[in-house]
Amino acid sequence: MATFKDYLSAFVYVLFPDACLACGGVIEQGEKTICSVCRVSFPRTNFHLDKDNMLAQKFWGRAKVEYAIAYLFFKKEGDVQSMLHYLKYKDCPEVGTLIGNWYGQELLENDFYKNFDVIIPVPLHPKKLRKRGYNQSACFGEGLSKIWKIPQSENGLQKVTHTTSQTKKSRQERYENMKAGFIVRNPEEIKDKNILIVDDVVTTGATLEACINLLLESGAKTVSVAAIAVTQS
């Protein structure tokens, strides 16, 4: 039997319906943040079905990656970009967690998650983290962690401040400079572990390349990558 609170909630919803953070349309009562239409229609990559997918190929000859997967394809001016804009710039960390939940659930059926021991997010610069208040990649990782029951080490990697200008540097020098911008906080935590490093959007993969190689050099057994989205080149 419906209570007064139920009727009040329905009345408030009619007056002030929530908007989907992807398409901007009205979301139904009971839906969270993203409407069911967007959830169904988002451009999925299905990279978990193809180990030699386009994201994995970005790292060929650059970093030894066990698996490289992304949930969605990123397209400028598309609904995925709109959703990620809210995640990164509009104080909506719940978007990252929700997407992590969805992706984690979709990968449960083939036991893909059993390949990993620890989830580590790509870190933000400390100043950016203080300004934003959260790491969007860690929000995504939190969503995966809750579904897969795998721990996330939010500070497993840290961004430090002593990188120098990339101007006039060779590609190798730029790479070494970028890698010097990260540290492994506790090498014992990752030693002989199968690490899943998570990111929001992958473009060139340069940042991930530096993080992957640093983790391997610090004792990780394997390193894999999972991202919310990847750009199509």
Can you describe what each PLM-predicted range is?
Residues 1-199, 203-233:
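Glycine-rich phosphate/pyrophosphate-handling loop used in enzymes and phosphotransfer proteins
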